Swiss-Prot record:
CDD domains, per database record: HAD_Pase
Family the entry assigns: Belongs to the HAD-like hydrolase superfamily. Cof family.
Catalytic residues identified in the record: 8 (nucleophile)
Organism the protein comes from: Yersinia pseudotuberculosis serotype O:1b (strain IP 31758)
Gene Ontology terms, MF aspect: 4-amino-5-hydroxymethyl-2-methylpyrimidine diphosphatase activity; magnesium ion binding; phosphatase activity
Listed cofactors: Mg(2+)
Residue numbers binding Mg(2+): 8, 10, 212
EC number(s) per entry: 3.6.1.-
UniProt protein name: HMP-PP phosphatase
PANTHER family: HMP-PP PHOSPHATASE (PTHR47267:SF2), PTHR47267
Role noted for this protein: Catalyzes the hydrolysis of 4-amino-2-methyl-5-hydroxymethylpyrimidine pyrophosphate (HMP-PP) to 4-amino-2-methyl-5-hydroxymethylpyrimidine phosphate (HMP-P).
Lineage: Bacteria, Pseudomonadati, Pseudomonadota, Gammaproteobacteria, Enterobacterales
Amino acid sequence: MYRLAAFDMDGTLLMRDHKIGSITLNALHQLADAGVTLTFATGRHYLDMKGILSHSGLNGYLITGNGTRVCDAEGNPLYGMDLPAELVEFVLRTPWQTNASIHLFRDDGWFTDRNDPDLLIAHTTSGFHFQLTEWDELPLTGNHKFCFIASHQELVELKAQLEQQMSGEADFCFSATDCLEVLPRGCNKGVALEKLSHHLDLTLADCMAFGDAMNDKEMLSRVGRGLVMGNALPQLKQELPQLQIIGRCEQQGVAHYLHHWLSSPHLTYSPEF
């Protein structure tokens, strides 16, 4: 019996309208009623997640910013990591050969120097929004992560530049095909979930996790049971071939799996609907 379930959000729980489907909500409530601790592990900001969970009537532990912050159900901080100040300064001052927009995340919000209203569509439920700023107006300390947003091919080329200039000083991952993240070295959802598990007197073997992108890899590979979404990035499926693939997000595949696990855990699971 797993005692904690960790869920990615975008591409795992959130539908195309950026809301959790009603069948999935019902399954999550059933899971909580069965005594399983709910944890939401996402690249989204705490303020964003607070709004989403409030709208959905859910409560649980939060791993946000791809592991840069861990909070309890009341929002009390349990663990955090920030980018080194000198690395933040380097990223902001370097004229990267790219058209990607740059986004910086701190406890007090999401900051960018480029106004792109289309990016707010994914945050309509919570009302979370970016704050336009000049980079030299922000402190160099207290910064969780950078996101670069552009086409995938452009980000692949940018990633090569970043790795060449900052090898060993930060970690890089694609949280979506059009979003490249720069994280503190050694920071990911897997490490954050391990910290949370220890806080709850659990081990990662006591946990199950669901995800669809490369920012879920460490979490999925280290828990007792990792479940890969049917719509997951091909690279994730290739790098974790040993893990079960379940249904797609838009089919509420998480709910389908949870209903099976809660009612017939002794039977072989099939993602077919």
